[in-house]
Amino acid sequence: MKIYNHKVESFFASSPAAQFAKTLPGGKSGTLVAAIWAELGDAQGRWESSRHLQAEAGAVPVTKASGKSRVVHFRFACNKHLRYTMYWFSFVSLNHSEWAKLYYRGQRDNGHSHHQALRALGAKWLKIIFVMWRDHKPYDENYHLANIARQKMRQAA
């Protein structure tokens, strides 16, 4: 298994995407970030927006509405490998990212289960990863924290 992991890591390191993908929390070692990028592929027009990527990964629920009834439930039709990879990436990010830890704690405080909170965190990460993948830009924790602060200021105004 160690040999396999080493081969995956070395193959991914030679990829052009590795230079910015490895900037994700926990991306410097292991095969988790490589697995995410393998699922994303290199077809730039594959998803129109981060919302489409989130749906592909099963990170957002399905809403069925008819007349006065409205039901929201877990998304079963999705890329299971990407969903599983994002679930574990979200879990790992709790140890490497302060905002991720705070977001997860906020979800738990709102009554969500551990799994629901990780899926919600995965949806947040997919927005960030989509922009990184589309624009070939590295992840910058400080830039993301500044965006969060700007959004909170807009909501308060």
Predicted feature residues:
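A detector of single, family-specific signature residues
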Residues: M1-A157
